[in-house]
Amino acid sequence: MIPLSLRIMPRLSLAIPTCDYHGKGDALLDDLLRTVQIQSFKDFEIVISDHSEDDKIETKVQEFSELFDVKYHRNSNKRGNSPANLNKAISLCTGEIIKIMFQDDFFYDDEAFEKIYYNLAGDVSKSWLLCGTNHTQDDGHNFFWDIFPRFNDNLLDGVNTISSPSVVAFKKDVLVRFDEELIYLMDIDFYYNMRKTHGEPIYYDDVLVTNRIHQDSISSNITNREELLQNESIYCKQKYD
């Protein structure tokens, strides 16, 4: 093993927050890592912050540990808080470019890393990138609903025309993080803050990732959704007023 002091930092870091996902977390992560395995761009690390209480995710990570550089961190802090878990994964990344990916999503394009890295690293005027995404309800057998992220004037009201954080990549020197007080609008708040702090992203209008629509997703299991949306919208507006 190469000592950390001598290790060459990767060009791209993939930040993946994980949890047990009602017992399906390891299978979902397996699907994602298989789409990582076939990426044309190989100069990357995978960073996993795991909120699971069992060992299934860690065991799955070990299966792939000889294929690529993986950092696994068992995170017991604020267990169940998705923004906190994602922030922890980001904090452990060392790459020039940090790519966020949720464990229930996966890469649609085997050149995704290459396209993200060269477009973002090659533009000194931009700090972040939003890529296109599609959706699946049957584990990738069929794909539908392409989204090419754009901002709108009602973003803080919960009108999300950007999609999930799996469409986001940003440069290492970006300090904006996810607000750990939020649940439903954690992504929207981040996008708004990024644009306010770092300006417009690169809008990369090519579908690079797939968002999985399923009953076990975090957004599908939010109770009192309308009340939560209203309260979080007020919180975000006051925050940026």
Question: Would you name each region that the model predicts?
Answer:
Residues 106, 111-143:
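Conserved donor NDP-sugar-binding/catalytic core segment of glycosyltransferases
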Residues 14-16, 131, 149-228, 232:
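Conserved nucleotide-sugar donor-binding catalytic segment
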Residues 33-77:
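Acidic donor-binding segment of Leloir-type glycosyltransferases
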Residues 29, 33-34, 58, 87, ...:
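Short alpha-helix within the catalytic core of nucleotide-sugar-dependent glycosyltransferases
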Residues 98:
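Short aromatic/hydrophobic "clamp" motif used to bind/position activated sugar donors
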